[in-house]
Amino acid sequence: MGTSGVRFLTLVKPFMFALPEVSSATKKIPVNEKLLWTSIVVFLYLVCCQIPLYGITNTKSSDPFYWMRVILASNKGTLMELGISPIVTSGLVMQLLAGSKIIDVDQGTKEDKTLFQGAQKLLGILITIGESVAYVLSGMYGDVKDLGAGNAILIIVQLFTSGIIVICLDELLQKGYGIGSAISLFIATNVCESIVWKSFSPTTINTGRGTEFEGALVALFQLMITKTDKVRALQEAFYRQNLPNVTNLLATVLVFVLVVYFQGFQVELPITPAKSKGMAGQFYPIKLFYTSNMPIILQTALVSNLYFISQILYKRYPENIIIHILGRWEEPEMSVSGQMRPVGGIAYYISPLNSFAEIVSDPVHALLYIIFILASCALFSKTWIQVSGTSASDVSKQLRDQQMVMKGFRASSMQRELNRYIPTAAAFGGMCIGALSIVADFMGAIGSGTGILLAVTTIYQSWETILLAVTTIYQSWETIRKESRDTDALKMFG
């Protein structure tokens, strides 16, 4: 198996020169420059979200990714149609292959690490091409016969080009030019945009109750002003159906607070210099969210691809029993989006429930959904540490390279001790991320529980990175000022 793994990575070598690549930073990038590059990346993403695809004839067809758009950072009918789906899917596939030892990757060697990243990028490009062709052939932009060969090819080229841009923007940030990763950044931007829009949107929608504002807060003020019965107006603003309400908004705020609170949970392992064991040591923190938001990102990639395949197959073969097992779809009554929802099969049982009333009405669905989310997040979290350089062996090697050891342990036994904490922290942290996502979904939070989790963890990590950089700069400045003051004193008395 190891030999086949090496052969697989070797097969990537001939393609490495043709893959788009961002050069690594040759010097340390100042924090203000990182903020500038990060802002440019966000601006380019928002621009691409607003530029419609040229050549499409139908924008009102059912959207297989409607329920996942916020999390996939995509926007239907625009250059950002694919969003981060190709990158995340390629990462998911390569992670599973490496984690299950189907391919042999030694993350400790530079060559294997480079080839693995190249293989992931190559797979991402192939998935971009595959999804672009699938979107066009599935009729998402109109019948292929109506589009014509020229328009169909043009749409595929636009989707492919924008997909390559997303891959390059992600690599730009990953190479140290910006803060965080484009994947998390785009999701956070999309989620925050969705929350703001659903809170303050002035768009009016004609429902069975009459014309209403889409924005929850706008609707609250409108109902309080126009209704004579203020108690009923408040009740309608807090609990209206099929549109964002104030309860959804309050649930969103509560989830934000909970995620920020749990971000501070960590276990600190004491470490000391290997050659000076009497010196005051430091601490190596193992956070509750050890793998951050990666488990939920990978779980989302899995579900989104299943949704897409299931809905396309059901549309073409609605009477096939095997397709029914994968998922049955229909448009719900009183729907203002016109989108399909899963009503049976695997797709239904792994879809979130959006209120406690739905839990009571279908407890089997709720139970299976909870089991799926918790198990998949724990599994992805444990697998992720093996390919991301954060496993017990990787951390042990990093500490040895820094001439550090765990207090009370020899260097040879350090990995065994770390194995007691890191895999458990990864699995438990993944389950906690999944549990918070479930709670947010059950409470009906705006932007979905998964989306809010991704947004909060991304914003929190970015804040920590900026704070660390500013603190480091301040400490360096204080050191220079002190040295300068000492030098001046020596000159005065020398």
Curated annotation (Swiss-Prot):
UniProt keyword Iron present: no
The membrane topology noted for this protein in its Swiss-Prot or TrEMBL record is:
Multi-pass membrane protein
> Which superkingdom, per the lineage?
Eukaryota
Q: Does the keyword Methyltransferase apply?
A: no
The family database entries (Gene3D superfamilies) matched by this protein are listed as:
SecY subunit domain
Residues that span the membrane, as ranges = 36-56, 79-99, 122-142, 147-167, 177-197, 249-269, 294-314, 359-379, 426-446, 450-470
GO process terms (BP): protein transport
In which compartments does the protein localize?
Endoplasmic reticulum membrane
Report disulfide bridges, numbered on this chain: none
GO cellular component, as recorded? endoplasmic reticulum membrane
Q: Which UniProt keywords apply?
A: Endoplasmic reticulum, Membrane, Protein transport, Translocation, Transmembrane, Transmembrane helix, Transport
What Pfam families would the database entry show? Plug_translocon, SecY
The family annotation for this protein states:
Belongs to the SecY/SEC61-alpha family.
Purpose of the protein: Appears to play a crucial role in the insertion of secretory and membrane polypeptides into the ER. It is required for assembly of membrane and secretory proteins.
Task: Describe the protein's quaternary organization and the partners it interacts with.
Answer: Heterotrimeric complex composed of SEC61-alpha, SEC61-beta and SEC61-gamma.
Protein's UniProt name: Protein transport protein Sec61 subunit alpha
